């Protein structure tokens, strides 16, 4: 392996709320502060609801305004 061509591999702290996770990375900054808890993402935690819709006012307003709008392709036009 050639010297001087690879980025430095160092400790990285990931902060989510009051929890801190430690890992190794080539990320240039030593820590990442997460706004949204990745453990509550609806993709792998069906009980948590939709985090984006709960925390984002624009998305919430859109959903209220277009509550009856459907993109279901199975419905036939009458």
Curated annotation (Swiss-Prot):
Name assigned to this protein: Large ribosomal subunit protein bL31
Family, per entry: Belongs to the bacterial ribosomal protein bL31 family. Type A subfamily.
GO BP terms in the entry: translation
GO function term, MF aspect, one: structural constituent of ribosome
Cited NCBIfam families: L31 (TIGR00105)
Subunit and partners: Part of the 50S ribosomal subunit.
Entry keywords, A to Z: Ribonucleoprotein, Ribosomal protein, RNA-binding, rRNA-binding
PROSITE patterns tied to this protein: RIBOSOMAL_L31
Function: Binds the 23S rRNA.
A cellular component annotation (GO) from this entry: ribosome
